[in-house]
Amino acid sequence: MGHKVHPTGFRLGVTEDWRSMWYAGSSNFGEYLNTDLQVRNFIRKKLAHASVSRIRIERPAKNALVTIHTARPGIVIGKKGEDIDRLRGEVARLMGVPVHINIEEIRKPELDAKLVAESVAQQLERRIMFRRAMKRAVGNAMRLGAQGIKVHVSGRLNGAEIARSEWYREGRVPLHTLRANIDYGVAEAHTTYGVIGVKVWVFKGEIIDSDAQPAAGGEGARQGKG
């Protein structure tokens, strides 16, 4: 059976950047990594309804810079900046150093793989048919300029006794092309029947050879199941 390499890890240092930017010696590396995981989990839990896509952590000279990419910056900042000030204090206590928080707005959440996956997962939790949720996500992404998108769901779909996986794709999603700008996101839908996993790949075009980008509708829609 074939297994797909993680699209982000595959392109690190080529077209993708690291989500944690710092240097640590062998004695501090584990501590920094564990702290980063705790901070990310804390922020995602705290801002569960703020459509947070990515969290980037930098550690310049005994300080910390946390950049939160969100589609709803108003919820993160709060009234007169009260919420972000409170969040800054809580993150600083977790990290043990002064923290500065930047907010980056995501202009087109329909093209962000993580937010698309979370949107599909939320629809599945509201008992919307999985095929309708997948096709809606694919249609929105293609309408807003994606060159290709693939949505994959797996689990007890529609409450079936036997778990299975199904996917829907439109356009091109070249997973082996390093210069391809592939955004990848994962989410989970916690339904009454169990957990349904959602994976999304969004192809936004080629980064290096931008003059030779293929047309957005190069391939027709395909559907499959496993």
Swiss-Prot record:
GO biological process, one term: translation
Record's GO cellular component terms: cytosolic small ribosomal subunit
Listed GO MF terms: mRNA binding; rRNA binding; structural constituent of ribosome
Bilayer-crossing regions: none
Keywords: Ribonucleoprotein, Ribosomal protein, RNA-binding, rRNA-binding
Any Pfam family the entry gives: KH_2
Domain of life from the UniProt record: Bacteria
Residue ranges annotated for the KH type-2 domain, each copy included: 39-107
Quaternary structure, from the entry: Part of the 30S ribosomal subunit. Forms a tight complex with proteins S10 and S14.
Task performed by this protein: Binds the lower part of the 30S subunit head. Binds mRNA in the 70S ribosome, positioning it for translation.
Family label: Belongs to the universal ribosomal protein uS3 family.
Alphabetized PANTHER family for the sequence: 30S/40S RIBOSOMAL PROTEIN S3 (PTHR11760), SMALL RIBOSOMAL SUBUNIT PROTEIN US3C (PTHR11760:SF19)
Protein name: Small ribosomal subunit protein uS3
Provenance organism: Alkalilimnicola ehrlichii (strain ATCC BAA-1101 / DSM 17681 / MLHE-1)
